[in-house]
Amino acid sequence: MKTTSCPYFYLIPGSFKPPHVGHFEMISHYISLSKKNNGKVIVFVSNPKKNIRYTGSGGIITAEFSKRKLEEMFGDEVEVRISDVSPVKDCYDFGNNIENANITFGCSTKDEDLKRFDTIKRYYNTKYPKIIVSVLPFSVKTQISAKDIRMEL
């Protein structure tokens, strides 16, 4: 039987390599929303085997590093999980263990985020019709690229 003690979830998948001020603004936004409805924010961090994120000096930014930094930023206000395959797939799979919940996918307004999350929403609406899914993009005040930061490290 599927159960949940938390009817509102804010799921945020991404690489977060490294976590930066734009990520901080976005995640903080979803934390403030979750506090209004006693919800829970879960961040899914990618753990790529092929598309490894190198710094400009040749170092590697790992999923464990990103997880640790996000936990330092947000403490117990956010649950951070490292994804085995893909953070988006983990968002798909998340619905397998809950029932009658409201799931909001957090994303930014940059790149292809909105298009990707429309696909997720269609998937959930077909496979889990009892779960209310919405996509709530957040436009960060500070447009920044994790790639640019990596190249400076």
Model-derived regions: residue spans:
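Nucleotidyltransferase catalytic core that binds NTPs
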Residues: M1-L153
